[in-house]
């Protein structure tokens, strides 16, 4: 699973996921399913935000490539992926500036057009079940919830899906591709089932034991699907700034 994650996701996403896990004392090399889940969630958050802007008239527009000097503001503020201290600093700043109610839990995004925080969910289960779990945890009508599944289903607060259909289709296609690639490598069942994941971990540990009689060959071949759908989703004009902002280590 670890090899798959490093091949499948943008290096910045992988770096952010590793940083987040280490912040909570978790090891990406051991908890590989969580590593994959965090990377997937991060990527969906970035895809949700990418190419969506607000123009000088306050209208929401989609710009994939255009005049870099245009007076455009990113529609979404990305909160997910930052260390907790910086994330709360961003949330507090937004609340002080806009007057919106401060959430009890860290949200994933802030939508400057609709003036609301957004909680993004990516589930391997039924979307309505995961939606209810999120809603019961957050207990706030102010935070908008949007859930995606690996099967192409989605569910959002008051059926308000925020994004246009094409943008949401990009996210669904990416999730479906991840699922298909995991399945083709025999990783999907363990990703869905914790019990199967434990069995797979024991199996992997046994395979990693030194053996005098044989050598293990590791294939780094990338499948045609991954070559075609490698994560080129990230807004290139934003990548450098995000990397500097998100990966900056706080001074201790």
Curated annotation (Swiss-Prot):
* A GO molecular function held by the record: RNA binding
| Domain of life, per lineage | Viruses
Query: Where located?
Result: Host cytoplasm; Host nucleus
Q: Which residues form the active site?
A: 80, 108
Where is the site described as Important for efficient shutoff activity and nuclear localization found in this chain?
Answer: 195, 198-199
User: In chain numbering, where does the site feature Important for efficient shutoff activity fall?
Assistant: 202-203, 206
**Keyword terms, alphabetized:** Decay of host mRNAs by virus, Eukaryotic host gene expression shutoff by virus, Host cytoplasm, Host gene expression shutoff by virus, Host mRNA suppression by virus, Host nucleus, Host-virus interaction
Task: Report the record's Gene Ontology biological process terms.
Answer: viral RNA genome replication; viral translational frameshifting
- Record's comment describing the protein's domains: The probable endonuclease active site in the N-terminus and the basic amino acid cluster in the C-terminus are important for the shutoff activity. The C-terminus acts as a nuclear localization signal. The C-terminus is recruited to host protein complexes involved in nuclear Pol II RNA processing.
What's its job? Plays a major role in the shutoff of the host protein expression by cleaving mRNAs probably via an endonuclease activity. This host shutoff allows the virus to escape from the host antiviral response. Hijacks host RNA splicing machinery to selectively target host RNAs containing introns for destruction. This may explain the preferential degradation of RNAs that have undergone co- or post-transcriptional processing.
Protein's name according to its UniProt entry: Protein PA-X
**What organism is this sequence from?**
Influenza A virus (strain A/Gull/Minnesota/945/1980 H13N6)
């Amino acid at each position: 699973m670890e090899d798959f994650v490093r091949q499948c996701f943008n290096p910045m996403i992988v770096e952010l996921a590793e940083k987040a896990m280490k912040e909570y004392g978790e090891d990406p090399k051991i908890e590989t399913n969580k590593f994959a889940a965090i990377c997937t969630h991060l990527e969906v958050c970035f895809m949700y935000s990418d190419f969506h802007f607000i123009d000088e008239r306050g209208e929401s527009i989609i710009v994939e490539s255009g005049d870099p000097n245009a007076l455009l503001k990113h529609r979404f503020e990305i909160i997910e992926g930052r260390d907790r201290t910086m994330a709360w600093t961003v949330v507090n700043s937004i609340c002080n500036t806009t007057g919106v109610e401060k959430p009890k839990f860290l949200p994933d995004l802030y939508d400057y057009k609709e003036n609301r925080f957004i909680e993004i969910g990516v589930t391997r289960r039924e979307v309505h079940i995961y939606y209810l779990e999120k809603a019961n945890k957050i207990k706030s009508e102010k935070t908008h919830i949007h859930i995606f599944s690996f099967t192409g289903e989605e569910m959002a607060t008051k059926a308000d899906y925020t994004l246009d259909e094409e943008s949401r289709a990009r996210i669904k296609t990416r999730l479906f591709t991840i699922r298909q690639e995991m399945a083709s490598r025999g990783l999907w069942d363990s990703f869905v089932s914790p019990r199967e994941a434990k069995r797979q971990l024991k199996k992997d540990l046994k395979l990693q034991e030194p053996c005098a009689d044989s050598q293990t060959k590791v294939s780094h071949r990338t499948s045609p699907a991954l070559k075609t759908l490698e994560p080129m989703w990230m807004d290139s004009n934003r990548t450098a700034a995000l990397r500097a902002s998100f990966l900056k280590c706080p001074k201790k």
